Design a protein with these regions (language model features):
Chain B
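Short phosphate-coordinating micro-motif centered on Lys-Gly-acidic
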Residues: 149
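Central hydrophobic cores of alpha-helical transmembrane segments in multi-pass inner-membrane proteins
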Residues: 11-30, 47-60, 97-111, 128-129, ...
């Protein structure tokens, strides 16, 4: 047991959370805010040097072990802080975004009566996430995994009076648990096959016995395939991948800073982190890796199509997150773990920026989230607008590819996203070509929905009717049309004379985090690309994730230019529909395809029918038929009923005549004696 | 110090509560009628005796050497008919005794609101504690049986007299179910004594290891014991007495029922079935696994549909006990350790959940879920406590609910992965019913005007919960402390089982 700065990074937020949470009645909101923010600040200040030492220094991976968590017959987990380039990357991502979100929340949550509780949850989340990324075995990973899950549950349902928030929180937790079902089985199988759950032991055993089989009877698979597959099921839940994505959009019920921190920058990327951490397993498991690729690519495209048709500003960004996570996964699936991690890194900046920017707009418009009721926000909120445009450019991956001797130049997303699309093109892994085309198509849609969001929110005339009625549906129950009729009236009365929105720019405590994140969105790519992806990648990663450097050079020009081309195309399309000819957008929104996309391919309806109603029906069946009719009916109640029946009839035997009784006794004695002799009871042994 | 070590600590722990009961009885006889303040004095006296029992059990714990093999603190006095008054503990029984003595004072605190015949209630509770502790330290089969069955009677009366509206039905159902199983066990006990010519449990274990019961006989003996323990635990399909008993029982009786009486079933499997009938245990493992998996899925889904808070938690107990049997009958070290851990953790968490129900029941006199809603608005501290134990029930890592679950599954996985795949769905279902319950009771706005004046936890309730909160978190974050302690017993059971399976 030793104490060190690395331990403080992880445990500091826990103590701050406990302090703020347990003593909130006595210390008040202000002190709770200061304590939690300061502790994250300390973690931040301690994390960056560690990370930069991997980037520019010559740090080696190291491990700090605290004490045994569980140790039963080789099933051993130790509370650890593992530091290598992978966890160091996550440390700076988590602490940076968390710190900025803490600061931002000072402004965003200023009116909330439960600020101390909010900051306590935020810090607890940060602790769990840090414990997750610094784990040295699968069980601590699982601990952090569930810890961030419960923090997410608490924060989505932070406004506990709202039924929709509570339902979203439960949905998030349960969907994640479906993933954890796979994760837990993966841990068990890893222990069963490799007799350990420590990363190094598992990876080296898997590498030493790559063809170890697992199965019963005719069902036999390679163990490493099965372990990788099961672990990925966990990642699908946490990172909201296709089939298990349904919770993420609903998670937007939480306060916006939470969406930025948990449901964009950090927690949802835990699945990507896990796949990269276990890259040495997926490396050996082409089928599982192919599955990762296909699911990731499908998610990237699917979520982008749904994002196109959403009206709630946060939901658009949420689907965008889902889609970008898909990119990260198919990058990992095709073996480009470094590209996946780099996209995770850059995405954290620009997606947190977009969420906090959206939060600023929502704040400025007094909690209006429906883009149909926005418009004309640029003028009253110029800084927010500028930051959102930077975020948008970074998200769509704007940049000029390398031409001849000139290196490419662009915003953060350009470096990471193009690297992913190119890796998919060059890979000959299962599903890689599918992933490439999904990636390119999704890039087109990303550009379209991002600009749609920017135009609908900031440009044109204000369409809202502030304070008039709040009975309108918030996206979820609303109609599929981008311009609901109910809001047609009265907006001119509320909009300012020049058509701009009656909004106010957010306070500086909210804007400064935006500016910092915008700086990251602009520069994170150009500064760190050489270390994550380029010439210094070997030195940076030091074998923590498998690298495939041999791809360079074989890339056709059209592949290099494809992302930029589709991005510009998406931009132009958005300009046409949402700036020049808004009537066309309304016409588009009346079509059945739009309704299909708006309703998210009807996943919620299908799941509700199968799982929710199914569970209720089976539960009732087991209870009312199984327990009450069959088990109790045949068991105790049946016995009771029949004994009542017999006792009624036996009563007739109670005649009251002594000789009847004595006669019965005689018969019984004879019968018993006969049985004893027959059975040999009492005979000498 | 060495003189202290030789005191008969187990006897003291076991019968100290009875001494308290006698004292109350004596006071009652002397007082001849109810004097003002009598009930209050009885409560305090009972609390003092149960706390003293806990302290003495800590002394016994201190005198116990977890590194030494076999049974310790042994007391063996010849008794009637050749049966011995024979007590002893290993680390398994030591932890269960500690669980019992730890929870009983909290139950007494939770019974403060009992107004009806306080003295009788407390006397029964004290006797019940003696019988429960006795079960775990009895080292003679007949003595074990007496304690095991004796526990039925006070519980029967507690439910039947202090229970809810359908208390008589519930009490009889409870009594008949458990008695039926026990009679079969009695027959098996007689048979075992006849075969092995001893009623001493350590001798029987040694006999099983060195001579061994005939495999064909083992089958019957195993089944007879199984009938008793399966009802007690309870396993599917003999579980339906539990929800009824819980619903009707007063809060503290529910706590004891869930936390300790159920554990006697698991204890029995570990003490008798596995080490004494290893080949039969091995033979029946698929059946036990199947019943466990059915219990987990079935009870979870049924719990999801309950409208009564206690019934929901009772069904969740059935599901959690499924993990216990899964772990125990894997026969692996991880599984047995997981089973033991799950029993301890369930003792604390389900006990605490029943106390949580008791808190609002005391205020509103209903357990109907639909009656509540939005409690967090009026009772934030209660809501936080309830949240913690809900998460424990869900098996969240960091609470005591997690290590037992994962270890049981890891152990069982090594025997049969397919059953474990099915059982692991329990981690999904537990979240479904537990979080739904929490939402319906604690979250949202207060819709029911009757809840408008409901008050948060008072000092007594807070004192009741704090030890449970601390235990849940310590057992969740540093389970290796407990696991290290129980490893000796778990290892010897696993060894005995493994030795008997492969002759």
């Amino acid at each position: 047991m030793q104490f060190s700065p690395e331990v403080l990074i992880v445990l500091g937020p826990l103590f701050a959370a406990a302090f703020a949470g347990l003593l909130q009645r006595y210390i008040g909101d202000r002190i709770a805010q200061i304590i939690t923010t300061a502790s994250i600040g300390v973690s931040l200040a301690l994390s960056w040097p560690i990370f930069l030492n991997f980037v520019w220094g010559d740090a080696h991976p190291y491990l700090i072990e605290l004490f045994k968590f569980i140790d039963v017959g080789g099933f051993t987990s130790t509370w650890s802080v593992r530091i290598d380039s992978l966890s160091a990357t996550m440390l700076v991502v988590v602490t940076t975004v968390s710190f900025l979100v803490h600061v931002y929340s000072w402004g965003y949550m200023a009116e909330d009566p439960h600020r101390a509780r909010f900051f306590s949850y935020l810090s607890f989340f940060t602790f769990a996430m840090l414990a997750l990324v610094t784990a040295n075995d699968l069980l601590q990973l699982f601990f952090g995994w569930e810890g961030v899950g419960v923090a997410s549950y608490l924060l989505i349902g932070f406004w506990y009076q709202k039924r929709s928030a509570n339902d979203a929180a439960i949905k998030a937790f349960i969907t994640n648990r479906v993933g954890d079902f796979g994760f837990a089985l993966g841990i068990m199988l890893a222990f069963f096959c490799y007799h350990s759950i420590r990363y190094e032991d598992v990876f080296s055993a898997a590498a030493a016995h790559p063809n170890l089989m697992f199965g019963i009877g005719a069902f036999q698979v390679r163990a490493v395939e099965a372990v990788s597959f099961l672990l990925f099921i966990g990642a699908m839940g946490k990172s909201a991948q296709f089939f298990l994505h349904v919770w993420l959009p609903d998670a937007m019920e939480g306060p916006t800073p939470v969406s930025a921190l948990i449901h964009a920058a950090t927690m949802v990327t835990a699945g990507v982190f896990m796949v990269c951490r276990c890259g040495e397993l997926f490396q050996l498991a082409p089928m599982a890796a192919g599955f990762v690729t296909v699911i990731g690519a499908t998610t990237a495209l699917f979520a982008a199509t749904v994002g196109v048709a959403q009206n709630d500003i946060k939901r658009v960004v949420a689907y965008s997150t889902c889609s970008q996570l898909g990119y990260m996964f198919f990058a990992a699936g095709v073996g480009a773990y470094n590209a996946a991690m780099f996209h995770l890194f850059t995405h954290a900046f620009f997606k947190a920026l977009l969420f906090l920017g959206a939060g600023s707009v929502i704040h400025g418009l007094h909690h209006e989230q429906d883009m149909r009721n926005m418009g004309g926000v640029r003028k009253p909120m110029p800084i927010t607008w500028a930051m959102m445009i930077i975020g948008t450019l970074a998200l769509i991956g704007f940049g000029i590819p390398a031409i001849g001797p000139f290196p490419g130049l662009g915003l953060a997303g350009f470096y990471s996203k193009d690297a992913i699309i190119e890796s998919a093109f060059l890979s000959n892994g299962t599903g890689a070509q599918f992933a490439f085309w999904c990636g390119v198509s999704a890039a087109f849609l990303t550009s379209f929905y991002s600009w749609r969001l920017a135009f609908m929110t900031f440009e044109g005339a204000y369409r809202g009717s502030h304070g008039a009625d709040h009975a309108h549906g918030h996206g979820k129950e609303g109609t599929a049309e981008p311009d609901a009729h109910s809001h047609g009236h009265g907006y001119e009365a509320h909009a300012k004379a020049d058509g701009s929105a009656p909004a106010h720019e957010s306070p500086w405590v909210m804007l400064v985090p935006l500016v910092v994140l915008a700086a990251g969105a602009v520069f994170a790519g150009i500064i760190f690309a050489p270390y994550f992806l380029g010439v210094h990648a070997e030195a940076f990663w030091r074998g923590v994730v498998p690298l495939h450097g041999e791809h360079e050079g074989a890339l056709p020009t059209w592949v290099t230019w494809a992302p930029l081309t589709v991005t510009v195309a998406g931009f132009l399309l958005a300009v046409i529909f949402y700036l020049w000819n808004t009537g066309a957008a309304k016409a588009l929104a009346k079509g059945p395809l739009w309704a299909f996309l708006y309703n998210k391919w009807y996943f919620d309806e299908i799941y509700d029918f199968i799982f929710v109603k199914g569970a209720r029906a089976i539960g009732d069946l087991f209870w009312k038929v199984g327990d009450q009719k069959i088990i109790d009916g045949l068991g105790p109640d049946g016995v009771a009923a029949s004994s009542r029946f017999f006792s009624r009839n036996l009563r007739k035997l109670q005649t009251g005549f002594v000789y009847h009784y004595s006669f019965l006794m005689l018969i019984a004695a004879v019968a018993f004696g006969a049985y004893a002799i027959w059975a040999g009871i009492g005979a000498p042994r | 110090m060495s003189d202290l070590m030789h005191l008969p600590w187990l006897t003291i722990v076991t019968f100290l509560p009875t001494a308290g009961a006698l004292l109350i009885l004596l006071a009652r006889v002397l007082a001849r009628g109810v004097e003002p303040g009598y009930d209050a004095a009885v409560r305090v006296l009972t609390l003092i005796f149960t706390i003293a029992t806990f302290l003495v059990s800590l002394v016994a714990f201190a005198a116990f050497d977890s590194n030494a093999p076999g049974f310790q603190l042994v007391e063996n006095v010849a008794w009637a008919f050749g049966f011995g008054y024979h007590l002893g503990v290993d680390s398994l029984s030591m932890t269960l005794i500690l669980l019992t003595t730890f929870l009983t004072p909290l139950c007494i605190l939770a019974s403060w609101s009992i107004q009806k015949q306080v003295a009788s209630y407390m006397i029964l509770f004290l006797i019940l504690e003696t019988l429960m502790i006795g079960v775990f330290c009895a080292m003679d089969l007949v003595l074990f049986y007496l304690f095991f069955e004796g526990g039925l009677i006070p519980m029967f009366i507690l439910i039947g007299v202090w229970g809810g509206q359908r208390r008589v039905y519930a009490a009889f159902k409870f009594f008949l179910y458990t008695l039926l199983g026990s009679i079969l066990m009695l027959v098996a006990i007689v048979a075992m004594i006849n075969i092995a010519h001893t009623s001493s449990i350590p001798d029987l274990i040694a006999y099983a290891q060195h001579v061994g019961f005939d495999p064909n006989v083992q089958i019957w003996l195993w089944l007879a014991f199984f009938a008793s323990f399966a009802v007690k635990l309870p396993m599917w399909p003999v579980h339906t007495w539990l929800p009824d008993a819980h619903v009707e029982a007063p809060t503290a009786a529910s706590v004891v029922l869930a936390a300790i009486l159920l554990k006697m079933g698991g204890y029995g499997f570990l003490r008798f079935s596995l080490p004494m009938f290893p080949s039969a245990s091995h033979f029946f493992t698929p059946m036990v696994f199947a019943l466990s998996v059915i219990a987990i899925i079935w009870a979870s889904l049924v719990a999801f549909r309950q409208a009564d808070m206690k019934k929901l938690i009772a069904y969740s107990s059935v599901a959690h006990m499924g993990f216990v049997t899964l772990g125990i009958f894997s026969g692996t070290l991880q599984g047995i350790q997981g089973g033991i851990y799950q029993m301890l953790s369930h003792g604390i968490i389900s006990g605490a959940l029943f106390l949580c129900v008791g808190v609002v029941y005391d205020r509103m006199h209903t357990r109907e879920i639909a009656f509540y809603g939005g409690l967090v608005n009026r009772m934030p501290v209660y809501a936080a406590v309830f949240m913690l134990f809900t998460m424990g029930n869900v098996g969240l890592p960091g609470t005591s609910g997690f290590p037992g679950e994962i270890l049981s599954l890891v152990g069982a996985f090594q025997v049969n992965a397919w059953f474990v795949v099915a059982a692991t769905t329990g981690v999904i279902f537990s979240a479904v019913y537990a979080l739904t319950l929490y939402r319906k009771v604690a979250l949202g706005n207060i819709e029911n005007p009757k809840l408008g004046g409901i008050l948060d936890l008072d000092g007594r309730e807070w004192v009741t919960f704090v030890p449970l909160i601390v235990a849940t978190l310590i057992m969740g974050l540093a389970p290796s402390i407990v696991l290290h302690f129980t490893e000796g017993a778990a290892q010897s059971i696993a060894t005995a089982y493994a030795g008997g399976v492969t002759p």
